[in-house]
Swiss-Prot record:
It catalyses: L-histidine = trans-urocanate + NH4(+). There is a cross-link at residues 143-145 (5-imidazolinone (Ala-Gly)). It comes from the Bacteria. This is Histidine ammonia-lyase. It is an enzyme of class 4 (lyase). The lineage of its organism: Bacteria, Pseudomonadati, Pseudomonadota, Gammaproteobacteria, Alteromonadales. It is found in: Cytoplasm. The modification 2,3-didehydroalanine (Ser) is found at residue 144. The gene is hutH. Pathway: Amino-acid degradation; L-histidine degradation into L-glutamate; N-formimidoyl-L-glutamate from L-histidine: step 1/3. NCBIfam families: hutH, PRK09367.1. It comes from Shewanella piezotolerans (strain WP3 / JCM 13877). Its main location: cytoplasm. Belongs to the PAL/histidase family.
Length: 510
């Protein structure tokens, strides 16, 4: 478990990846406390002066012009959390909720939200106790923020809802007891500050980003294995080709392949003077395709890294002037578009991998035994494994349709354009699982092809990757129950061990 002293607005992608993938204890930097207290004091000043300000002493959405009496302000905060906790579907994973909470703490602590330190410390205590609110996956359109998911996340502050502790569902009251907390009475603006924001969609999109990075690394390593297994040429990775075009992602992807394949191997030397002039695109154009995916991954990383440190509730409190201004930072369009770009990249990584599988099992193209098995006919080898890969790749093509172009007005047309960011980000997990499955099949196929090339040896990095797999899955000498082999290869990919094969500074969060 890592310990993080949080200076609001300064989370790095590497820190966020660690929070997403492992447990963390949080401590708020002392430097943040003054701004938090000043911001909360400005909200109280509005009440003391009897002014009417949206989000502090008014209704919400279409009811924004309804002034709320001072005696009802605490009830208003409780009511908004309870009424907006209207999500549905399966609960998000604890890791996702943990990341949501840290992102919310990060945003609230910047001093623009008018929320008391006591409330922020409450959320920190829940994270540190590893007691996580139960948050349904569905119910947000990504504007006005992720209202339903964040409301569910905040129910335990009122001793409402369910929580998750060490894999077990418990009541909020039980969760608060474990964390040593008492329910809070929220003050003016605090309910809205808690449930308004993009932290649910951003957390999901960041998880998608990290999966996309892992898949890019795996695609590069396994793609290099396929080059060797198919006796492909190294010349398409020549740096001069990619410099002539000038696309940074492509240049870096080609460098990755040169790093993995080296200048030569026993396999490459064996076919220097073969009759084959050019390789199929799925081998030859890997830097162009994977490089384009890398560009999208890097762009999404920039957008999501900014969003993770941004303030996305409404209205915002500006300490230098005392102004409290309504805007629209809760609109998650940047997150939605970043997630859409990631979806395209994840789909393409799977699509080209499936084509490499098809190449390897086709003896006319690879010069390997049909379906990568001895005694074909009696044995079917990788025939249906490729069908599985095709099914997964095809499913992702449907998922890759951009979600951000869809919008459905809500709240009596007051919220008349929305981002659909939460779905845009949520589907990335399913898409990542699909592409991981395709790559698992390619990993098995490439290793099988390399075994058929023996005694010739591939590049050092390729041989290492094959050896890691062979510790889990043996050579396929005859037909056997194939499913467990795919699962074992998938489990290997989940470890993200291939990230370490890449040169430094390729992946934004690694």
């Amino acid at each position: 478990m890592s310990h993080l002293v949080l200076t609001p607005g300064s989370l790095t992608l590497k820190q966020i990846r660690e929070i997403s993938r492992g447990k963390v204890t949080l401590e708020l930097a002392d430097s943040a406390i003054a701004d938090i207290n000043t911001s909360a004091g400005l909200v109280q000043q509005v009440l003391d002066e009897g002014r009417t300000v949206y989000g502090i002493n008014t209704g919400f959405g279409l009811l924004a012009n309804t002034k709320i009496a001072a005696d009802d302000l605490q009830l208003l905060q409780r009511s908004i959390v309870l009424s907006h906790a209207a999500g549905t579907g399966q609960y998000m994973q604890d890791a996702t909720v943990r990341l949501m909470m840290v992102l919310k703490i990060n945003s609230l602590s910047r001093g623009f939200s008018g929320i008391r330190l006591e409330v922020i410390n409450f959320l920190i205590a829940l994270v540190n106790a590893e007691v996580y609110p139960c948050v349904p996956e569905k119910g947000s359109v990504g504007a006005s923020g992720d209202l339903a998911p964040l409301s569910h996340m905040c129910l335990p502050l009122l001793a409402e809802g369910e929580m998750s502790y060490k894999g077990q569902l418990i009541t909020a009251a039980e969760g608060l007891e474990i964390a040593g907390l008492k329910p809070l009475e929220l003050a003016a603006k605090e309910g809205l500050a808690l449930l308004n924001g993009t932290q649910a969609s951003t957390a999901l999109a960041l998880e998608g980003l990290f999966n996309a990075e892992d898949l890019f690394a795996a695609s590069s390593v396994i793609g290099a294995m396929s080059v060797e297994a198919a006796m492909g040429s190294r010349s398409p990775f020549d740096s001069r080709i990619h410099a002539a075009r000038g696309q940074k992602g492509q240049i870096d992807s080609a460098a990755v392949f040169r790093h993995l394949l080296g200048d030569e191997s026993e396999i490459s030397l064996d076919h220097v003077n073969c009759e084959k002039v050019q390789d199929p695109y799925s081998l030859r154009c890997q830097p162009q395709v994977l490089g384009a995916c890398l560009t999208q991954i890097r762009h999404a990383a920039e957008v999501l890294g900014t969003e993770a440190n941004g303030v996305t509730d409404n209205p915002l409190v500006f300490q230098d002037t005392g102004d409290i201004i309504s805007g629209g930072n809760f609109h998650a369009e940047p997150v939605a578009m970043a997630a859409d770009n990631l979806a395209i990249a994840i789909a393409e990584l799977g699509s080209i991998a499936e084509r490499r599988i098809a190449l390897l099992i086709d003896s006319n193209l690879s010069k390997l035994p049909p379906f990568l098995v001895e005694n074909g006919g009696v044995n079917s080898g990788f025939m249906i494994a490729q069908v599985t890969a095709a099914a997964l790749a095809s499913e992702n093509k449907t998922y890759a349709h951009p979600a951000s172009v869809d919008s459905l007005p809500t709240s009596a047309n007051q919220e008349d354009h929305v981002s659909m960011a939460t779905f845009a980000a949520r589907r990335l997990r399913d898409m990542s699982e699909n592409t991981r499955g395709v790559l698992a099949v390619e990993l098995l196929a490439a290793a099988q092809g390399l075994d058929f090339r023996r005694p010739l040896q591939p590049a050092v990095a390729v041989a290492k990757a094959k050896a890691e797999l062979r510790e889990l899955v043996t050579y396929y000498d005859k037909d056997r129950f194939f499913g467990p082999d795919i699962e074992a290869a998938t489990d290997l990919l989940i470890t993200a061990s291939y990230n370490a094969y890449l040169p430094a500074d390729i992946l934004p969060s690694w």
